[in-house]
Each structure stands twice: as structure tokens, then as C-alpha cells.
Amino acid sequence: MRAPTDMPSGPERRERRRGAGRGRVFLVVAAVVLFLLATSLRGIAGFYTDYLFFDSLGLQKVWSGVLGARIILGLTFTGVFFVLLLINLIIADRLAPKFRPAGPEEELLERYHQAVGRRSGAVRVGVALLFAVIAGSGVSSQWNSWILFTHRVDFGVTDPLFDTDVGFYVFQLPFLSFVVNWLFAAFIIIFIVTAVAHYLNGGIRVQAPLQRVTPQVKAHLSVLLGILALIKAADYWLQRYELTTSTRGVVEGATYTDVNAQLPAIYLLLLIALLSFCLFIANIWRRGWVLPVLAVGLWAFVAIVAGGIYPTFIQRFQVQPAESTKERPYIRDNIEATRAAMNLGEVQTQTFEYDENLTAGDLIDNAETVGNIRLLDPGIVNDTYQRLQADRGFYRFNDLDVDRYEIDGRTTQVVIGARELNEAGVPQQTWEGKTLAFTHGYGAAMAPANAVNAAGQPDFVVSNVPVESPENIPIDQPQLYIGEDQTGYAIVGTNRQEVDYVSDDDETVPFEYDGEGGVRLDSFVRKAAFALRFGDIDPLISDFVEDNSRLIFLRDVRQRVETLAPFLRYDSDPYPVIVDGRVYYVLDAY
């Protein structure tokens, strides 16, 4: 045992405990920082590699434009919410009663105030900032609506219901509706947080026997409820315009029930919202909460009956029994709008005389049309293409399409499919095999849709590996690095030769990429960023990867195009075309 004189004194022991406590705090903080850094690095890598993708295609302005819109929206809405909530929290502190009568809740509240002490201002700012970040976190996803809103163009065509230019519905209504809905949700949060602040300050006493809410607090909360009513009134005003895209009736757009039941109900709800605003404001000078309860009760009743039950009743018992009569003018409006949108306003109707009895002369006179009657169905012959033309297990025909090409001097319907890479069939299921060696598909297969060979199989005009094709449909560069449902990534231009194809005698024919596609891996930072993005360290440490190597990712056609131009709507089926000796993909956009 140590002698008492050897024992540390009281101050020394306290100093050691403080030092140990500081050490534990440091370790906890360091662990939290390392965790946040590790989880955020991958996000930063994804952000940076997205920029490299756009930069490799010369589309930096698209990337920066979308990013700028996201930042503006996020900062603006976060800032607005922060200011609104902070103002209300400051008001709540200013309205706090100077004397809090003793009660069951006083002990708990006293502990809160002792803990906060003089840091109440910092607490207000911290709470406001926390909720502001939450409220503004998802706003950046509305960047497309914001860009449309700021670049409105009038179409010169008005809708038949409100006589408003169609450009308003395309460019402005979506963003305005979002803003109103966001404001309504924001003020609900502000109301709740403000009410909690009043409770902590003693302005609301749940267990008080008499006055549970001070007059000042009641006035503050009544104003917030009035603001909510005004925002909802604005929402009802915009809901009128949203009826023009209703899907309730037989056609898209406002139909009988929308115009004669839903629209009057919306006007009534708008008036109820304005009346509720007046009742909430009047409640400032009245005792109790009778007026707010009356307003909310009336509002809920009208919303259920007029906004829900009544339109449903009209649709079921007035419209459906006589739909052709009730909906006729709205169907006519829909047809006229469709013609205007498709530029079919000048359609001329002609009557053709025809005879249902087909003769040999008719067949001779229409030999070209008859000769192009399709015998091959893309959905049925896909397995045949796979069996006859996939050549190896690492190729596949994801899907076949119908197109027209000139064959033997005649425009002919053909069934065409791209011979894409099948990653699951790659013989070397290693990182090197799937990423460096087997990197691409090869060419296409094409057969006339109106003919088969003697064996009843497609009569291929473009076929085989290496590609065989007629002179007018050459394929000089058959390598396909992207495709339909193509996943993963490929690194090309490495010192490990790619497999172009395997010949009939099982000899591997190599290929060396000399194109400009993909992102150059010419720095440690780029290699590390892609390693983080894909959760794969090999791009960073592989000896095969050189400064001239390029990484090709986002290889699915639709995903790639949607990333580059997310403001368009795309058809679900890309289709391959052979142009200038190469296989391209076409994806229709609207």
C-alpha cells in the first residue's frame, strides 16, 4: 500500500479526472469525425465523378446549370424557413411570462431553464437551423420545375375552362403548387415548434387549473393559424387550374364532374379558408378557443362533404348513367386540344371507295406493299437470333426492333438487334476479366422481316462475328461499349489488351481502344474518386491502369441519356441503327 503522503491530493485527483474526461471526449469526437468523413467521402466522390462524366462529353454547362439551380433552391428555402422559425422563437421568448406560478410542471421547466441559462439565444439559432436544414433538404429536387418557372414561354393557346395560356400550366403551375404546399408544411412545423417554445417558457400550462394559455401566446398562435388558412386558400386557388389535368372522366382533362361539382367545391373551400382566417384573427381579442374550433370543424365538414362525397355522387349517379351526353363537350375540347398540340388542326377528311374482295390484280398492282408484309415478329424470333447469332455466351440480344433499310435497291422492313455484352456470360468472372478484358459487345444482326431462308430461319443480311454485311450497310467499328440494361463499368486503353472477339478456332482476337470516350484516369485523385464511387479499390491499385486509360460508366443507354438531359421524357425502348459504319442507339424524347 502507498503511504498517505504518497497519495495525490484532492486538487490533483480532480485535475486527473478532468484530463481523463477530456481524453474520452476527444476520442468520441474523433470517432464521430472519422465516421462522418468516411460516409461523406463516397458522396463527394460521386459528385466529382458526375462532373467528370459531363466534362468528358463537353456538357459542363448542363452539370453546372443543374447544380446551380439545386444550390439556389436549397439555400433559399432553407434560409426562408430559418428566418421564419427564428423570428417566431424570438417572439415566443419575448412573450414569456415574467412570473410562472407554482405547479406540477414547474420543476421540470425550472431544470430546463437552468440547463439553458444564458445560452437561450444559441439554442434558438440551433433549433431554427436544425429544422431549416430538414425543411430545405429535399427542395433541390425541384430544380427542373424552377428552371421551367424562370423560363416561361407563352404558347399562344388558351385552355377552354379558365382561358389561361397553356404555357402557365407547363412552366409555372408545377413550381407554384410546390411552393404553396411547402409553405403549408413549413408553417405547420413552425406552429408546433413555437407552441413547444411557449410551453417551455411557461406561456402554456397544460395542467393549470384555470388559464392554460396566456392572452399573448393565444394571439401569437392565432396569427400562425391565420397564416396557415391563407396559404391553404392559395392552394385552393391553384387547385382550380389542376383540374385541367384531371383523370376522373373518360378523357384526360376537366370533365363534367370536375366543372360542375369539384370546381364549385373548391370555390366553397376557398371561401371557408378565408372565413377561417378571419375567425383566427378575431380570436386574438376573444377568450377561449371557440372560434378556431368552429373554423376547423366547419372546414373539415365542408372538405369531406363538398370536396369528396358530392363530386363522387355526381360522377356515379349523374354522369355514368348518361356519360356520352354529359361528357360530349369535354371530349370535344380534348380532341381539339390534342389536334392543336400535334399540329393536326388542318386535317382534311376524305372518303375512299374500296372493295373487300381481293383479286390477283390487286396483289400485282400492290406488289411492293405485299412483298413487305412482315413474317418475323421481333418478340418471337429473339431466341432464334440468340441461338444463331450470339456466337458466344458473353454476347446477347437484349431486344429486337423493326426498322427500314435499303436491301437490293428496295426499302425493306428489317428486324435488327445489337449484339451486346452479356456480363454474366463472361468466362473470366474476375475484376480484370469483366472490367479490362471483356469490355464491349460486337456489331449487330439484321434480317428482312418479310423473308426466311430455306430452313425457315431469318435470312440474315448483317450477321456473324466478325461482321459480314452488304456494302451499303457497312459496320467498320462494331465495338459496343454501351447498350440496353448494360451495367458496371469498363476501363479501356490499358496495358491489358481487350478481347475483341473469339474466332471460330477459339483464338482470341485482341483490340486496342483508340477513341476519346470515357473519363481519363490521368491522376491519383480521379482513380481514387472512381474507386470510392464503385466501392472497388482495383482502379486505384491495378498495374494495368495507366494515365492514358479511360473509364466508361453509366453504360445503359436510357440511364446515360436521362443523366445528361433529365428535363426530357423518354420512350422506354432505345433501338439500334447502323449509320456511317457504326452502331448507334436512338431514344425518342419528348
Segments from the language model and where they lie:
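Soluble extracytoplasmic regions of secretory-pathway and membrane proteins
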Residues: 3-17, 24, 30-55, 59-590
